[in-house]
């Protein structure tokens, strides 16, 4: 999709950071619990591209599957992914000279407590099914605030559940930025 000159983006291979792709691949292919007593890759994409679309939009949809983003920077296509990592820089009041931190956050109404994730099921020949994910503590505190999510290219109930769980945890815990 990225390098093909006929139907792809015609991005030269020299513009791709193979280490970014390898790192993302390792994280995506790591086996995790599927919720049914087995294991499956953390992220799997089953997608057929059969219509013309803006290449950038297709790439962003595909990278969103693994909580990533692709952008062109420093002469190459760079992949970044939301995943556990070590801190790269500790920012605190001792790092700021003659200034104050300004914080902004999200309103509680914007934070969801349940997610309904639409995915396609292999067992029912690709029919759309829904995985309901609930943050019990948040529901007890704020009530039911639903978020509908369409999991593009997702055929796994376990992956759909992880998508919903990550969305809810992110909205409840990552509410303030500086």
Residue positions per predicted region:
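C-terminal extracytoplasmic interaction modules
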Residues: 1-178
């Amino acid at each position: 999709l990225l390098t093909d000159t006929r139907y792809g983006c015609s991005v030269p291979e020299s513009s791709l950071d193979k280490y970014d792709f390898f790192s993302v691949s390792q994280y995506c292919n790591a086996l995790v619990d599927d919720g049914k007593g087995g294991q499956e890759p953390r992220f799997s994409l089953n997608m057929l591209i059969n219509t013309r679309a803006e290449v950038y939009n297709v790439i962003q949809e595909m990278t969103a599957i693994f909580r990533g983003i692709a952008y062109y920077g420093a002469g190459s296509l760079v992949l970044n992914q939301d995943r556990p990592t070590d801190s790269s820089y500790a920012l605190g009041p001792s790092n700021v000279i003659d200034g104050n931190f300004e914080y902004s956050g999200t309103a509680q109404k914007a934070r969801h407590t349940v997610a309904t994730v639409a995915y396609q099921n292999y067992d029912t020949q690709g029919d759309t099914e829904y995985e309901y994910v609930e943050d019990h503590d948040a529901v007890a505190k704020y009530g039911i605030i639903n978020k509908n999510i369409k999991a593009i290219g997702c055929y796994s109930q376990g992956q759909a559940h992880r998508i919903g769980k990550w969305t809810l945890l992110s909205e409840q815990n990552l509410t303030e930025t500086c």
